[in-house]
């Protein structure tokens, strides 16, 4: 028949931060090969699936992944060889059974995910389909509104900005290609503004600029200036999205948020909610990810009650792409969106289950990269297959980020007249869809 798995290979390669990661090849009986490499995060949720590292400080500073690779070769491969690559659910469930732990700590989520994604790519190639067509079938025609990271702070840079990501979303574009053009123009305009003010234009892990700004507010003000100077209207054409990654700022002992890179100010949950409420009134912000810490469920509830009808509130560390945590959030009325990171959960099957649960509850879903990426473009196909309408995959620089955007441009071209770009209409979880304009 040809579609059964004949062999699985695995190797240690290097990601965009110079750290080792896992790449797997799934080879079918007829010689068809699917290859995939897994990403890695810098700021990680405490409930994420475990990324297995070797821990030998004398090799790659302890970040080697040879244990994960051995698990693929010695445990996963013997069980999967002979199985049908066309049954993704069976493949993923077999690996979950082999691991047997809630966080995949035995085999490593990096081992499991590499094989899961490579299997899907092999199956698609065997059937003569693109990955997005194979995974999404007839529904795979929505191109995502991108969240483009243009200023980095926090754990993704070495500057005085507390919040990790300041992003732009071209909500007024008519096509994905136009959205990328708009974002690129703002990116280059911002570079000119930073140069003019004497700020460095070096970039962080995700390709955004990492200037040593005077305050967190200055980042928003610079972005608004760049949007206007590029010829667009803030809010109407291009909105701002934030990922403050506040779990990195939260002290669970004092239950306070410490703005440790800027003012050293300590804020209670209530004060943090008010902080974001004022920002939403002041700036054209449409989305805030991890506006409260993952342990601070009460704070999350207060934030959702306060501004959840106005903007998209995205749970990343809060939900870690896990249906158990998402279910809790839905029942509590916490957040209105989930960030989807395949390596947080570890298999494509579980990823699809999380998106399905979110959609049924009226939550939006955003497919996301990690700060440590590779040239693998699977998430570009995945976002179209899932039809979530939003992607977060870094800035308009660094090949590891651009590769995903370029793949989406190709997909849009392939879809021709059936391609859809929903722009600001992707925010179906918000009751009040009016984005503040300036």
UniProtKB/Swiss-Prot annotation:
Coiled coil: none annotated. Keywords: Cytoplasm, Glycolysis, Lyase, Magnesium, Metal-binding, Secreted. It is found in: Cytoplasm; Secreted; Cell surface. It catalyses: (2R)-2-phosphoglycerate = phosphoenolpyruvate + H2O. (2R)-2-phosphoglycerate binds at residues 164, 341, 370-371, 392. Belongs to the enolase family. This is Enolase. It comes from Borrelia garinii subsp. bavariensis (strain ATCC BAA-2496 / DSM 23469 / PBi). The gene is eno.
